[in-house]
Amino acid sequence: MLLAVARALRPVARSVRTQVRPRSTVAEAESRFITGHPDCNVTPYIANLVGRDLHKKSAHPLGIIKDRIEAYFAGLETSYDVFDGEDPVVTTTQCFDDLNIPPEHPGRSKSDTYYLTDTELLRTHTSAHQSQHLRQGHEAFLCTGDVYRRDEIDASHFPAFHQMEGVKLFSEEEMNGQTDFSDKEAWLASPECDIVAKDLKATLEGLIKYVFDDPDLQTRWRDDYFPFTEPSFELDVFYQDEWLEVLGCGVIHADVLERCGLASRRGWAFGLGLERLAMVLFAIPDIR
């Protein structure tokens, strides 16, 4: 179904370009994001990319992919809350500290990230909202939004793109009655950690096969590293005679949950780029 829609919309998708904003809106964007702070490195060009909300446009390739993913999760037994309008301006605590990303990490540097002040920035990933929603009591949710990184612009890189974050916590019953995870090494070797990882992989394999509209789609898992998950994985699919990386994920790191006041809970998280999937499924040769 999705592939049929993608084929029909490919000519339209290839013609999509950055929107031109009215002058008044441009001025508002620049006044908010170009703060005059010594650490501000947001340019007028970047300021005017914020708030386009391409993922909310139902006929746009990103909107189609987002709606398809949300439809898959709506069909699962677990009920997922959906967020797609969070403010792209976050704090360094939200974007980095809450997620085990240390001060010396290159992703925090001004060469990689757009800062408004020394403590505020344009989010570099939708994971910046993970701890916020967990603290608010959301136990399963999807969060989609525009993210910003100081990438060199080419056919596959653009400084503004879109991600979706997914999180699921497990109940005490699902964890075989376990609530004491203070021994972190024992946790990683436990049957309960395996339960979470297996559920994560089964859920995401189902998602990707649903998005690609192919129940026989070949997938493979690779171990990886992310500061905010342990263990961590990458999922690849074999599509049009080549392996493609489609998402990263893992079991939520114990330290992340402890900071949220959830030391007795365990769960998983994933993050995927909407542009990556849209470029493949809609045969879009240039991310711009």
Residue ranges and their predicted role:
Residues M1-T25:
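N-terminal mitochondrial targeting presequence
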Residues R21-R288:
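TRNA-recognition modules of translation machinery and tRNA-sensing kinases, especially anticodon-binding
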